[in-house]
């Protein structure tokens, strides 16, 4: 494998990771339906250390707007409830019956849906900027190789890098459009 192929391969892997991170980020924005992905980044203060909710409890959604959080350790119930209640952008009704935490999401108003669309667009733009930064770093690496390998090879590598960047930016746009449609669906 040539040095140019290594640079392109590394950029491709980093862009793929950025795309996956963007999709996960989109999943954390509520569309009015209970989805375990909404609670992916919730950290619970479990005996003094921040612990991901998924490690402390099972998550099920028996109804479209209801999520049941079943702690593995009943002693963590209060802390789990507190972590969910203090989540930013979560205007859910949270109830604790001593065994489980029931999270009921309210119907989203049109204004709230539009607000969430703006948030998702911001996350999409951040992902595109990250992909372009990866392209810029890879291009700098290719430019540094101009003395070692032929200019034609570097130009081919840059062309391949541009196509890779365009593809990944388009994939972010597709995921963004799907999430926007999901958010605006009543």
From Swiss-Prot:
Keywords: Cytoplasm, Protein biosynthesis
One of the record's GO molecular function terms: ribosomal large subunit binding
InterPro entries registered for this protein in UniProt: Ribosome_recyc_fac, Ribosome_recyc_fac_dom, RRF_sf
Subcellular location: Cytoplasm
Domain of life, per lineage: Bacteria
Cystine bridges: none
Any one Gene Ontology BP term: translational termination
Gene Ontology cellular-component annotations: cytoplasm
Protein function: Responsible for the release of ribosomes from messenger RNA at the termination of protein biosynthesis. May increase the efficiency of translation by recycling ribosomes from one round of translation to another.
Family, as annotated: Belongs to the RRF family.
Protein name per the record: Ribosome-recycling factor
Organism: Leifsonia xyli subsp. xyli (strain CTCB07)
Lineage, top ranks: Bacteria, Bacillati, Actinomycetota, Actinomycetes, Micrococcales
